[in-house]
Amino acid sequence: MLKPLGDRVLLKIEEKEQTVGGFVLAGSAQEKTKTAQVVATGQGVRTLNGDLVAPSVKTGDRVLVEAHAGLDVKDGDEKYIIVGEANILAIIEE
């Protein structure tokens, strides 16, 4: 399992095809955001005083993330993205 460092977050993107009138939209025509599940978080960032500020998200949260943010990574057969916490726009509460 991958463990992000600092304020980085490991996400599993929830894949969904978008259609218009039965036609599947190309990737570039889809939304500017993606829904993802938080798989793991880094420990947070340190302030100038040395205090640790923990991430705002936790493992299991569903989040809204910028569509083109992050770095694609693989762990075995699983595909993930690693993003900075600043690229997470919102926590989806259900």
From Swiss-Prot:
<keyword id="KW-0143">Chaperone</keyword>
<comment type="function">
    <text>Together with the chaperonin GroEL, plays an essential role in assisting protein folding. The GroEL-GroES system forms a nano-cage that allows encapsulation of the non-native substrate proteins and provides a physical environment optimized to promote and accelerate protein folding. GroES binds to the apical surface of the GroEL ring, thereby capping the opening of the GroEL channel.</text>
</comment>
<dbReference type="GO" id="GO:0044183">
    <property type="term" value="F:protein folding chaperone"/>
</dbReference>
<dbReference type="InterPro" id="IPR018369">
    <property type="entry name" value="Chaprnonin_Cpn10_CS"/>
</dbReference>
<dbReference type="GO" id="GO:0051087">
    <property type="term" value="F:protein-folding chaperone binding"/>
</dbReference>
<keyword id="KW-0963">Cytoplasm</keyword>
<dbReference type="GO" id="GO:0051085">
    <property type="term" value="P:chaperone cofactor-dependent protein refolding"/>
</dbReference>
<dbReference type="InterPro" id="IPR020818">
    <property type="entry name" value="Chaperonin_GroES"/>
</dbReference>
<dbReference type="GO" id="GO:0005524">
    <property type="term" value="F:ATP binding"/>
</dbReference>
<dbReference type="GO" id="GO:0005737">
    <property type="term" value="C:cytoplasm"/>
</dbReference>
<dbReference type="GO" id="GO:0046872">
    <property type="term" value="F:metal ion binding"/>
</dbReference>
<dbReference type="GO" id="GO:0051082">
    <property type="term" value="F:unfolded protein binding"/>
</dbReference>
<dbReference type="InterPro" id="IPR011032">
    <property type="entry name" value="GroES-like_sf"/>
</dbReference>
<protein>
    <recommendedName>
        <fullName>Co-chaperonin GroES</fullName>
    </recommendedName>
</protein>
<comment type="subunit">
    <text>Heptamer of 7 subunits arranged in a ring. Interacts with the chaperonin GroEL.</text>
</comment>
<comment type="similarity">
    <text>Belongs to the GroES chaperonin family.</text>
</comment>
<dbReference type="Pfam" id="PF00166">
    <property type="entry name" value="Cpn10"/>
</dbReference>
<dbReference type="InterPro" id="IPR037124">
    <property type="entry name" value="Chaperonin_GroES_sf"/>
</dbReference>
